[in-house]
């Protein structure tokens, strides 16, 4: 019996990294019976007499699991955020950030397509960039999106971690990976003018060994509707709100209608970004109104 990490999932086969080799495996039937689905990033026990015919025996406990993209035991996520074509969406960025906060994954925000902005448009984006930095997020937003110093700094921070690339379809995840590791030659697709959505250029989930980091290149998406947290958990997923919520008059303050709320005061004083607070209110309403998801 061996232990390893699932490096790729494709059509019922799972490629496992172990002993600096890759073993192709299948899941035993009892996984299906117990409705357990192995995902990329899983630490597994498996048997294999050769590198082509192995079987997964056990999935070891997961530290976390992202639903979209489906990756387990993630340390960091590079949220590739388009500045233009498709247009920047703070709401989509915040949806992704709270999903990562809920799973205890460290987000890194990477603005792509900044070179498509006019100088005026770039200047207008800078306060937003600085706003996310002020919260504590690491933000990469050079005027040239693939600036060599910026890429080197990003790569240095990713080494030794399981990393997922996530972001809106067409945001440039594959393009960024191609700049980090040109030898990969990943497929990239031009934006569909009709839908303003990218053609999905990625059809499988893989962990790519890029200069010492295991990076998932995964299908893009056009929206992000996964809200697995409660309304009471939500304020803690906005770090800038969690930081000052102790100053609210009422414990468990949801920062909506409560009097003497430190968070609302911080929004009014420009300490907390208005766009973030508006997204918080929208997410709160969505979570409060969504139907319970009973897992079988």
Curated annotation (Swiss-Prot):
Family per UniProt? Belongs to the TRAFAC class YlqF/YawG GTPase family. RsgA subfamily.
Look up keyword Iron and say if it applies. no
> Pfam families, per this entry?
RsgA_GTPase, RsgA_N
Name of this protein: Small ribosomal subunit biogenesis GTPase RsgA
Asked if the Swiss-Prot or TrEMBL record annotates the protein with the keyword Cytoplasm, the reply is: yes
Which cofactor(s) does the record list? Zn(2+)
Q: Keyword annotations for this protein? A: Cytoplasm, GTP-binding, Hydrolase, Metal-binding, Nucleotide-binding, Ribosome biogenesis, RNA-binding, rRNA-binding, Zinc
Instruction: Tell me the CDD domains matching this sequence.
Output: S1_YloQ_GTPase, YjeQ_EngC
Q: Which GO terms describe its cellular component?
A: cytoplasm
Organism (species): Limosilactobacillus reuteri (strain DSM 20016) (Lactobacillus reuteri)
Instruction: Locate the residues binding Zn(2+).
Output: 248, 253, 255, 261
Q: How many and how are cofactors bound here? A: Binds 1 zinc ion per subunit.
Question: Which top-level enzyme class is recorded in the Swiss-Prot or TrEMBL entry?
Answer: hydrolase
Q: Which GO terms describe its biological process?
A: ribosomal small subunit biogenesis
Binding positions (GTP): 112-115, 167-175
PROSITE patterns the record matches: ENGC_GTPASE, G_CP
Please give the start and end residues of each transmembrane region.
Answer: none
- What EC number(s) is this enzyme filed under? 3.6.1.-
SUPFAM superfamilies from the entry?
Nucleic acid-binding proteins, P-loop containing nucleoside triphosphate hydrolases
Per UniProt, subcellular location reads as: Cytoplasm
Query: What gene makes this protein?
Result: rsgA
Q: What is the stated purpose of this protein?
A: One of several proteins that assist in the late maturation steps of the functional core of the 30S ribosomal subunit. Helps release RbfA from mature subunits. May play a role in the assembly of ribosomal proteins into the subunit. Circularly permuted GTPase that catalyzes slow GTP hydrolysis, GTPase activity is stimulated by the 30S ribosomal subunit.
Judging by the UniProt lineage, the source's domain of life is Bacteria
**What are the protein's GO molecular function terms?**
GTP binding; GTPase activity; metal ion binding; rRNA binding
The record places domain CP-type G at 63-224
């Amino acid at each position: 019996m061996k232990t390893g990490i699932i490096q790729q999932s494709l059509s019922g086969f799972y490629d496992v990294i172990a002993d600096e080799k890759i073993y192709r495996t299948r899941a035993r039937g009892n996984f299906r019976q117990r409705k357990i689905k192995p995902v990329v990033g899983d630490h597994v026990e498996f048997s294999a007499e050769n590198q082509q015919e192995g079987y997964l025996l056990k999935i070891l406990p997961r530290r976390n699991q992202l639903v979209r993209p489906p990756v387990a035991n993630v340390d960091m996520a590079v949220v590739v955020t388009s500045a233009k074509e498709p247009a920047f969406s703070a709401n989509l960025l915040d949806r992704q950030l709270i999903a990562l906060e809920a799973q205890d994954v460290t987000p890194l925000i990477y603005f792509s397509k900044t070179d498509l902005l006019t100088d005026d448009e770039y200047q207008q984006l800078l306060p937003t960039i600085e706003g996310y930095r002020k919260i504590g997020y690491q933000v990469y937003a050079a005027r040239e999106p693939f600036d060599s110093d910026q890429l080197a700094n990003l790569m240095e921070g990713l080494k030794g971690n399981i990393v997922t690339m996530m972001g809106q379809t067409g945001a440039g995840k594959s393009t960024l990976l191609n700049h980090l590791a040109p030898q990969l030659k990943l497929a990239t697709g031009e934006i569909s003018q009709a839908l303003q959505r990218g053609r999905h250029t990625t059809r499988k989930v893989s962990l790519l060994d890029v200069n010492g980091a295991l990076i998932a290149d995964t299908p893009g998406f056009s929206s992000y509707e996964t809200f697995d947290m409660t309304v009471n958990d939500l304020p803690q997923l906005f770090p800038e709100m969690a930081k000052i919520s102790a100053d609210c008059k009422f414990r468990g303050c949801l920062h909506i209608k409560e009097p003497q709320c430190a968070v609302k005061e911080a929004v009014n004083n420009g300490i907390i970004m208005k766009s973030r607070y508006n997204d918080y209110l929208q997410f709160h309403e969505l979570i409060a109104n969504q139907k319970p998801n009973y897992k079988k």
